[in-house]
Amino acid sequence: MIRKLDDFDIKILDLLQHDATATMAELSEKTGLSANACWRRIRLLEADGVIKNRVTLLDPQKIGLGITVFVCIRCAEHSQDWLDNFLQIVNESPEVIEFYRLAGDIDYLLKLQVASISEYDRLYKKLVSRVKLTDVSAIFSMEELKHSTILPLPETSDKAERKV
């Protein structure tokens, strides 16, 4: 079920998407709610699964993981056992940072963050040796032009004016 967000929820989410380290005092000042009201709303948003997690975003380049690889996978097999095996391999591979099942010509898309081509090759060999795949192709990113973790939120009314 999708939670109905009011203007204050949207304002809090907007602020936290930009800075998850914002204090209750800062959130209170920017929303016009008390710090306690902000805290209660955040707890409800977490309990309802609207806020999934609060994380620190790292710069892959600065920690030696400067190669982004998109792996396009086609397969002939689609059974639950096959998918369970595939998921297990993906879940035990920390290089895989995103994983999607797609509609269209490609069945699955993986996004990897690796330090080197040889690290990608090691993962590729592990994958093809343990999962029956029809086709695997890799696309190496030359440059990241946009990356955002901020989701678009509905506009708020005047009650909780956005001040980011």
From Swiss-Prot:
Q: Which GO terms describe its biological process?
A: response to amino acid
Q: Under the cellular component aspect of Gene Ontology, which terms does the record hold? A: cytosol
PROSITE patterns, per database record = HTH_ASNC_1 (PS00519), HTH_ASNC_2 (PS50956)
Q: Which residues form the HTH asnC-type domain?
A: 5-66
Q: Which Gene Ontology molecular function entries are recorded, alphabetically? A: sequence-specific DNA binding
Q: At the top level of its lineage, which domain of life is listed?
A: Bacteria
UniProt xrefs under SUPFAM superfamilies: Dimeric alpha+beta barrel (SSF54909), Winged helix' DNA-binding domain (SSF46785)
InterPro entries, A to Z: ArsR-like_HTH, AsnC-type_HTH_dom, Dimeric_a/b-barrel, Tscrpt_reg_AsnC-like, Tscrpt_reg_AsnC/Lrp_C, Tscrpt_reg_HTH_AsnC-type_CS, WH-like_DNA-bd_sf, WH_DNA-bd_sf
Q: Which UniProt keywords apply?
A: DNA-binding, Repressor, Transcription, Transcription regulation
Q: Does the keyword Transcription regulation apply?
A: yes
Which Gene3D superfamilies does the UniProt entry name for this protein?
Answer: 3.30.70.920, Winged helix-like DNA-binding domain superfamily/Winged helix DNA-binding domain
Question: What protein am I looking at?
Answer: Glutamate uptake regulatory protein
Q: Which organism is it from?
A: Zymomonas mobilis subsp. mobilis (strain ATCC 10988 / DSM 424 / LMG 404 / NCIMB 8938 / NRRL B-806 / ZM1)
The gene name reads: grp
